[in-house]
Amino acid sequence: MRVATADEVEEFEAVSVRGFENEAATITPGRIHPPAILDEPRMVLWLGQVEGKPIGAAMSYRTDEAVGIFGVTTIASTRRRGYGTALTRAAMLVDSGLPSILAPSPEGEGVYRRLGYEQVGELRIWSRQT
């Protein structure tokens, strides 16, 4: 479902942390995604639910040239059931007239290849220690 309220942003953030960390992980609400993120019309947060319980998340950000898909995750106990694929499809269709791009984790590469994505380059990440 498309996140539309501050409470849903909080659920989105919590399930994102649980998906990327572990199912017992917690976070202070608004630490990563404050409710004001809903004011950004190009950003869409997606919350996957099964029987009303949050199980996964994804984000899409639309520019004039493409839709970027980020942060696709599901909690460990719900993986390998197609939920990550469904969340990615929802994010892809935010503006179906534009191509979509993403930078997959090694675990997600197979999912994205099955959805028709192709590798077009190498992502270089830079870091500066403080």
Model-flagged regions — what are they?
Residues 14-26:
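Helix-loop element at the rim of GNAT/NAT acetyltransferase active sites that forms part
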Residues 46-48, 125-128:
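Short beta-strand element of the conserved SAM-dependent methyltransferase core
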